[in-house]
């Protein structure tokens, strides 16, 4: 039951300070999407006794366009940040493609967060289910007023009243003030580059941040080893002065993307280019939708089919890809075939139906998939557990293991690393407790999936802290669904580089998989590495720079007097070519921990 708690107590007058990243003027002609004096129109929704709201006066100051602010005190932190939420409906229409500006001012009157800042997530969303957000911005501020300018292009159209401004405030106990709220629509007559923007930053983004040196040490320790090439002559004696060329061919660490299996399996110029990019960029893939239960049963219509999915999986296997399957059970009614709802009053029959599905799909794809997400997003999706009891989760793992004795069987969830820098959310705690329960009950959990759909940056050292928390289970961890918004492409590239570096430096992580790479097939198109026309974005350049340059080993040299050539390289597969006079030999090598030796002999037996 939600109760609106309003307190109109007048508090002391406030002083003013702000920091601006840009001083661009606001373009003329913008239409307001919100009512005049919207602060007075905002309504608070919150669980009983968890928050209170009031209007407070603000001491006038030059350049400050407001004389009052909305003050919200979060008393008890709810499970989800939007459970303490300010809402104001739109009063004008927005059309897909319109250039808009969200502007607001924020300060912390009081906070218990260790950063000394208060937090708010401000968004403009559909006013009904599915609450799609056109813009979603995480902000934080200390005790001085800070202005935020957030330009965006509307991705959907909504008539007046069918969208709403929202401010989520369900964080650690804090008192936050927000003022000067404006939401302007410039239509298509203004370039987004001409609209002011607050440059986002995050702790550790500095080029000389201390964590970077630590990351390099960890990467050298955990992702590299010594490769020794020993060259012998026909008599088996060490051959000095031989030329050695070491060429890396494939990372041991998994770098990958979600892919559309029916596109991988289908002919056509666009699909040819799609496959080409996959083969060039990745050594690991996961299906985006094709293997989800309704798609697997062709309930989402063409072009999904078991035949195309299996054909694509066979091609990927031929090309040497490590393949993730996603997902056997997404335990909410909206994510399973509709007929299962008929069994909501029959737990035994529901258990049987899910068990049979797991066995059928894993049997059909056996030998083609290396690891499965057995269960996806249990924090937000638990209808099946509500009917059957939470012990049914253990049954799902055991059903998968009965068919797949060697595959890694993952649990997967979101908002663990991508929690706005928070390390104490109900979602994180639930995930930890779920993993512990599964292991205690004997479920053969083989890995921990961390989706990583970001809206705002989590500082790299906070990423390490969270990874350490889940590393205690001694299971491989994988980044399974990374994406980061691209409204600021420079920030997108910078954070992609830093996040990848942080996870590559952590010994418990064995893979980094993004949730799509091409704008033409991406659930969040601005997150893609390649634009619709095929051109690469800065985040794509950052990915390639790391994976194929900074973390890639190609080396040339000569054998020493003992016939050996040594190089420290990144773990993975190599091609080694040795030449001496007119003799030449090429052999494959695999560089593992703690190191590998390849012996190349010319002539003889």
How would you describe each model-predicted region?
Residues 260-271, 292-307, 334, 379-389, ...:
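Acidic-and-aromatic substrate-binding clefts and catalytic sites of carbohydrate-active enzymes
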Residues 22-256, 272-276, 303, 326, ...:
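Extracellular and organelle-lumenal recognition/adhesion modules and their flexible linkers in secreted
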Residues 255-258, 371-374, 396-428, 447, ...:
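Aromatic-lined carbohydrate-recognition surfaces of secreted/lumenal glycan-active proteins
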Residues 266-281, 566-573:
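Short Pro-Gly-centered beta-turn/loop motif in secreted/extracellular proteins
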Residues 6-16:
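Bacterial N-terminal signal peptides
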Residues 111, 115, 284-298, 307-417:
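Substrate-binding cleft and catalytic face of glycoside hydrolase catalytic domains
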Residues 193-207, 333-336, 342-343, 350, ...:
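Aromatic-rich peripheral "rim/lid" segments of glycoside hydrolase catalytic domains that contact
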Residues 104, 150, 229, 285, ...:
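Conserved, mostly hydrophobic/aromatic
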């Amino acid at each position: 039951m939600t109760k609106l708690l309003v307190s109109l107590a007048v508090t002391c007058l406030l002083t003013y300070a702000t920091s601006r990243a840009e001083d661009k003027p606001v373009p003329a002609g913008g239409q307001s999407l919100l009512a005049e004096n919207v602060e007075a129109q905002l309504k608070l929704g919150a669980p009983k006794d968890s928050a209170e709201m009031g209007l407070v006066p603000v001491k006038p100051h030059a350049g400050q366009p407001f004389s009052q602010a909305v003050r919200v005190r979060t008393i008890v932190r709810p499970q989800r940040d939007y459970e303490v939420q300010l809402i104001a409906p739109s009063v004008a229409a927005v059309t897909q493609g319109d250039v808009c500006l969200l502007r607001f001012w924020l300060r912390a009157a009081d906070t218990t967060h260790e950063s000394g800042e208060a937090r708010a997530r401000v968004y403009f969303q559909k006013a009904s289910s599915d609450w799609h957000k056109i813009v979603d911005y995480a902000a934080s501020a200390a005790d001085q007023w800070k202005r935020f300018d957030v330009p965006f292009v509307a991705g959907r159209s909504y008539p007046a009243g069918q969208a709403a401004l929202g401010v989520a405030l369900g964080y650690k106990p804090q008192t936050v003030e927000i003022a000067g709220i404006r939401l302007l629509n410039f239509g298509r007559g203004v370039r987004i580059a001409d609209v002011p923007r607050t440059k986002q930053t995050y702790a550790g983004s500095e080029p000389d941040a201390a964590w970077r040196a630590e990351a390099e040490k960890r990467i050298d320790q955990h992702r590299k080893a010594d490769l020794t090439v020993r060259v012998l002559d026909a008599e088996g004696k060490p051959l000095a002065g031989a030329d050695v060329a070491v060429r890396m061919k494939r990372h041991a660490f998994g770098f990958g993307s979600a892919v559309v299996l029916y596109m991988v399996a289908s002919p056509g110029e666009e699909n040819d280019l799609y496959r080409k990019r996959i083969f060039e960029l990745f050594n690991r893939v996961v299906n985006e939708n094709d293997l989800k239960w309704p798609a697997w049963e062709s309930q989402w219509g063409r072009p999904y089919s078991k035949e195309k999915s299996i054909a694509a999986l066979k091609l990927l296997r031929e090309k040497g890809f490590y393949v993730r399957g996603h997902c056997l059970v997404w335990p909410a009614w909206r994510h399973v075939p509709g007929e299962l709802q008929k069994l909501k009053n029959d737990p035994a029959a529901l258990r049987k139906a899910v068990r049979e599905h797991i066995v059928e799909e894993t049997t059909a794809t056996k030998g083609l998939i290396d690891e499965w997400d057995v269960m996806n997003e249990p924090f937000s999706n638990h209808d099946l557990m509500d009917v059957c009891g939470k012990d049914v989760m253990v049954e799902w793992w055991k059903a998968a293991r009965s068919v797949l004795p060697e595959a890694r069987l993952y649990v997967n969830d979101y908002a663990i690393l991508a929690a706005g820098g928070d390390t104490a959310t109900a979602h994180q705690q639930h995930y930890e407790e779920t993993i512990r329960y599964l292991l205690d009950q004997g479920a053969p959990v083989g890995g921990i999936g961390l989706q990583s759909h970001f809206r705002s940056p989590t500082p790299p050292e906070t990423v390490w802290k969270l990874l350490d928390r889940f590393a205690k289970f001694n299971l491989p961890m994988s980044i399974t669904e990374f994406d980061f918004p691209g409204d600021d492409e420079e920030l997108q590239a910078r954070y992609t580089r830093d996040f990848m570096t942080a996870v590559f430096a952590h010994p418990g992580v064995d893979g980094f998989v993004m949730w799509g790479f091409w704008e033409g097939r991406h659930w969040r198109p601005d997150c893609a590495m390649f634009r619709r026309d095929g051109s690469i974005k800065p985040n794509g350049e950052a990915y390639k720079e790391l994976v194929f340059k900074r973390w890639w080993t190609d080396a040339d040299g000569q054998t020493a007097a003992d016939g050996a050539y040594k190089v420290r390289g990144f773990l993975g597969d190599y091609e080694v070519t040795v030449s001496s006079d007119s003799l030449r030999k090429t052999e494959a090598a695999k560089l593992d921990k703690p190191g590998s030796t390849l012996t190349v002999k010319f002539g003889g037996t």
